[in-house]
Swiss-Prot record:
It is an enzyme of class 4 (lyase). NCBIfam families: pckA, PRK09344.1-2, PRK09344.1-3. Residues 1-23, 64-86 are annotated as: Disordered. This is Phosphoenolpyruvate carboxykinase (ATP) 2. The keyword Cytoplasm applies. One of its GO terms (molecular function) is ATP binding. GO terms for biological process: gluconeogenesis. The lineage of its organism: Eukaryota, Viridiplantae, Streptophyta, Embryophyta, Tracheophyta. It is found in: Cytoplasm. It comes from Urochloa panicoides. Its main location: cytoplasm. It catalyses: oxaloacetate + ATP = phosphoenolpyruvate + ADP + CO2. Homohexamer. ATP binds at residues 324-331.
Length: 626
């Protein structure tokens, strides 16, 4: 191009978007340049040796040949397996399986981004939603299978655990556990790759548990990445042998003709071996709740109380525990933007204070809305697992009202996704222990102060009432009792946990409260639901200490102490009898509920702690009197 003075204009290309050729000879080399190598542990073989031991066949006494990394990523490169232990002379006569001749690739503690990629390549049912969450399916099972859960009954557990009527613990023997374990391992070892997570339970560093999860699905690995406490690189280097291991072979069925099996689904726990085996169900919640059951066994042995509760802390350091079954408002009332969230579901109470067991939240999603649950709504983003939700195939927007797959739709996300989460998830000793009940009979007070015996009684009872439809279309309340507000997960007799709760409350000066979030002025269909703003005022009065200085009067039958006045709450609703126009119907309904409490408690009445029955007698004295 000519310049104004007749010369030639030259161009300076340094400011343009041109560049030197890339330093790669093949497309594979270019791909390798795209991904910067991550830092590795000081001893790269160390976790593989430990994982190989975890995957070892009990019959052959040695683990598979393991290679770290995705088989696709290492294609063309010669595998460098770890050397497994050779079998003993006694095991040498047992024929080696074909799986010992192949390499199993271990994908170890992958990041969420890596697990997304694995999930997309592994299953047609994994998609990214419009907000960045991973939507996936859990297969035929969309909830837990409590009837298929088994616990090994041996000389120790036969004496320690709660067995029989009312207990969630269904027995199996050690031999059948080992058979199921071998079945799960044979399946996992036959795969080209398995996902392994090494993580922690319990934010109290003095009492945390090392857990290893071995699974065939990337979504399960991401789920547990979110739900357990995530180790740092330094902690992984010294992780060593886990305290407990889950073998999740849920894509492979159990043998329904084997002993103790009732279906092709089987969830087995051996407390002696510190292992859990999952067959025939891909529902991720089995892993979370299985570990919770294990914590219910291990922690009380250390003098630590494990609790199925929510927990938050005020600005002054006052901690509150919230217990309640589904529909009582536990999540709503424990989520308070004026207080820090320690956890939403599983906690420990030790001499150090309270601590969250988990590193994440597993929230229900059915009918989720931004207006009602903004924290959960905003937490559903990249890294979150959305289980069994329905979404628009083009926009990928989730329809949280759609129950086509199940009503039990769930979101699993790290607790850090909640803006007011307290990290680390620990706090001082609780000042208040709040037991929530949605009483659809309408006879329990909106709030009652409990003494220690009453706290133990209502904690063991774990009461709420649901509204169930009858054949003629009339809806009647149905009482529901779940010991310790989580009977499905406890290992010991409920009285043991109740005694530990009372001991810690007395030692650290906590007060017990029973809060009814249900009906007033009549049962469901006659009275009205207690307004949420009133319940929030009650909870605020508990947190502030206002109710400690209130005047109280005692109710009949249940013998509950109810305050005569609370700021912001109409005094007439504090006494249930005041709100019923039909006083005879009130008395009849009150006695009916009291009878249901007594009938439910019969299974607990004969349990002894120590050499006498004094504690149980003390608890029974707090029962309804009529």
């Amino acid at each position: 191009m000519a310049s104004p003075n007749g010369g030639v204009t030259t161009y300076d290309y340094h400011d343009s978007d041109s560049a030197a050729p890339v330093n790669a000879q093949t497309i594979e080399e270019l791909h390798s340049l795209q991904r910067k190598a991550a830092t590795t542990t000081k001893d790269g073989a160390s976790p593989l040796q430990s994982i190989s031991a975890s995957l070892a066949s009990l019959a052959r006494e040695y683990g598979p040949n393991l290679v770290k990394g995705d088989p696709e990523a290492t294609k063309g490169a010669p595998p460098v397996p770890i050397k497994h232990q050779q079998p003993s002379a006694a095991a040498a006569t047992i024929a080696a399986s074909d799986s010992s001749l192949k390499f199993t690739h271990v994908l170890y503690n992958l990041s969420p981004a890596e697990l997304y990629e694995q999930a997309f390549g592994q299953k047609k049912s994994s998609f990214i939603t419009s907000t960045g969450a991973l939507a996936t399916l859990s297969g035929a099972k969309t909830g837990r299978s409590p009837r298929d859960k088994r616990v090994v009954k041996d000389e120790t557990t036969s004496q320690e655990l709660w067995w029989g009527k009312g207990s969630p613990n269904i027995e199996m023997d050690e031999r059948q556990f080992v058979i199921n374990r071998e079945r799960a391992l044979d399946y996992l070892n036959s795969l080209d790759k398995v996902y392994v997570n090494d993580q922690f339970l319990n934010w109290d560093s003095e009492n945390r548990i090392k857990v290893r999860i071995i699974t065939s699905r990337a979504y399960h690995a991401l789920f547990m990445h979110n739900m357990c406490i995530r180790p740092t690189e330094e902690e992984l280097e010294s992780f060593g042998t886990p305290d407990f291991t889950i073998y999740n072979a849920g894509e492979f069925p159990a043998n329904r003709y084997a002993n103790y099996m009732t279906s092709s689904t089987s969830i087995n726990i051996s407390l002696a071996r510190r292992e859990m085996v999952i067959l025939g169900t891909q529902y991720a919640g089995e892993m979370k709740k299985g570990l919770f059951g294990v914590m219910h066994y291990l922690m009380p042995k250390r003098g630590i109380l494990s609790l199925h509760s929510g927990c938050n802390m005020g600005k002054e350091g006052d901690v509150a525990l919230f217990f309640g079954l589904s529909g009582t408002g536990k999540t709503t009332l424990s989520t308070d933007h004026n207080r820090l969230l320690i956890g939403d579901d599983e906690h420990c109470w030790s001499d150090n204070g309270v601590s969250n067991i988990e590193g994440g939240c597993y929230a229900k999603c059915i009918d989720l809305s931004q207006e009602k649950e903004p924290d959960i709504w905003n937490a559903i983003k990249f890294g979150t697992v959305l289980e069994n939700v329905v979404f628009n195939e083009r926009t990928r927007e989730v329809d949280y009202a759609d129950k086509s797959i199940t009503e039990n739709t769930r979101a699993a996300y790290p607790i850090e996704f909640i803006p007011n989460a307290k990290i680390p998830c620990v706090g001082p000793h609780p000042k208040n222990v709040i037991l929530l009940a949605c009483d659809a009979y309408g006879v329990l007070p909106p709030v009652s102060k409990l003494n220690l015996a009453q706290t133990m009684y209502h904690f063991i009872s774990g009461y709420t009432a649901i509204v169930a439809g009858t054949e003629d279309g009339v809806k009647e309340p149905t009482a529901t009792f779940s010991a310790c507000f989580g009977a499905a997960f406890i290992m010991y007799h409920p009285t043991k946990y109740a005694a530990m709760l009372a001991e810690k409350m007395q030692k650290y000066g906590a007060t017990g409260w029973l809060v009814n979030t249900g009906w007033s002025g009549g049962r469901y269909g006659v009275g009205n639901r207690i307004k949420l703003p009133y319940t929030r005022k009650i909870i605020d009065a508990i947190h502030s200490g206002e109710l400690l200085n209130a005047s109280y009067k005692k109710t009949e039958v249940f013998g509950l102490e109810i305050p005569t006045a609370i700021n912001g709450v109409p005094s007439e609703i504090l006494g249930p009898v005041n709100t019923w126009t039909d006083k005879a119907a009130y008395k009849e309904t009150l006695l009916k509920l009291a009878g249901l409490f007594k009938n439910n408690f019969e299974v607990f009445a004969s349990y002894k702690i120590g050499n006498n029955n004094s504690l149980t007698e003390q608890i029974l004295a707090a029962a309804p009197n009529f």
